[in-house]
Every structure is written in C-alpha cells, then in structure tokens.
Design a protein with these regions (language model features):
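Extreme N-terminal starter segment of soluble prokaryotic enzymes
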Residues: 1-4
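Small-molecule kinase domains that catalyze NTP-dependent phosphoryl transfer to phosphate-bearing small molecules
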Residues: 59-65, 146-190
C-alpha cells in the first residue's frame, strides 16, 4: 500500500505528473474529489468550497469572514443548509486527506498533504520545482494563457500557497527534508520524473 503526495511550485507540472503516476500505478487521483468531499461533509456546494480554497489565507478571505453576520449564519443553519469558512475548510481538509490516505494506494495532489501525512508510514512525499520562467511558459502552453496572464497566475498561486501553509502552521514547504524526492523539472523531463517516482514506490 502506498500514498503518494504531490507538492509543487505552481506551474511546474504537478497535476500532470500526478495523473500520469496514478494512471501508471492504477491508483485513484485525489484532486477535485477532495473539494467534493469537503462540500459533502459541510453540506455546502462544491463552488463554495472552491471559492474558500482559492482565497484561503488571503486578505479577501479575512475581510469576507468579518462581513458575514451571525444573523445570516443563524438563518443558514435554521434552513438546514451548511456553512463553511476558512477554518472549517482546513479542519475538514485534514480529516478528509487522512481518510483518503487510510484507504491506501492513492495519489494526492497538494493541499498541504505532505504536512497532514508527514508521519504516515506508507506515504511518499514528492516536490516539483522549476524556474519561474519555465513555470510561466508551462502555464502559457498548457492553459492557453498570455505571458502576462500566466505570470499573474503563477505569482498569485505562489502567494496563496504560502498563505495556506501558514494557516496549517507551516512555512517551510520547499524544505527538501520534508520529501522523499525533489524533482527539478528544469533538469529532467516528465517521463523521467514519472519513472523515478514509480520506481521508488514499487521497489519498497
């Protein structure tokens, strides 16, 4: 049984590699499914969870949380509809990622899974890094963005990830000692990365 977590600098190809690993090993790939599971537990829409996730740790999130009145929350609860904010999202995130890992043989993309499963005996933690220029180029190529827009997205996601990890009490997500394998995607191609991860997992 193996649990593979994929952490990455945004635009380094983590989602692409994660899907390839899952396909190669015939493992499920946990990404958007995590959003759906959080939404189900909190009794809210997946879109609501996506919005919370996108703004986790940002100033906008804190501003919005202050704007939500207790009266509004009481009305939502009275209607037996759920409610979720940044803290509730993080609490559910920890529980759900741990639950997914307990089922075994899975690839989990991001969301602080390398921290949440740090002590999991069957977990392999992978980090992808790359030069910012290459990450911007990756976003242009794979998501059909202009160079300006791709740079904006990469910068925003870099800041958002740091904020999210701070909320989890961690600020050192690029510390190589957290990971079994760090892949510099500026030095190797996707096929080599796939081979390295699969060999590591299957040779245990």
């Amino acid at each position: 049984m193996a649990v593979i977590t994929i952490s990455r600098q945004f635009g380094s190809g983590g989602q692409t590699l994660g899907k390839k690993i899952a396909e190669k090993l015939n493992y499920p790939f946990a990404d958007n499914e995590i959003i759906q599971m959080v939404a189900k537990e909190a009794n809210v829409s997946s879109q609501w969870v996506e919005n919370i996730e996108k703004e986790a740790g940002t100033n906008l999130s804190r501003i919005l949380s202050k704007m939500v009145s207790q009266k509004w929350i009481d009305r939502v609860l009275a209607d037996e509809r759920g409610y979720i904010d940044e803290k509730i999202y993080l609490d559910y995130l920890v529980l759900i990622i741990a639950k997914i890992a307990d089922e075994g043989d899975v690839v989990i993309l991001g969301r602080g899974s390398q921290y949440i499963l740090n002590d999991h005996p069957d977990a392999y933690h992978i980090l992808l890094i790359d030069k910012k220029e290459s990450r911007v180029n990756f976003m242009e190529k794979h998501y059909n963005l202009s160079e300006k827009k791709a740079l904006q997205v990469v910068n925003f996601e870099d800041r958002r990830r740091v904020s999210l990890y701070k909320k989890l009490g961690k600020i050192d997500y690029e510390d190589p000692s957290l990971y079994h394998l760090v892949l510099n995607m500026n030095r190797i191609d996707m096929d080599t990365a796939l081979k390295l991860v699969c060999e590591m997992v299957t040779q245990k």
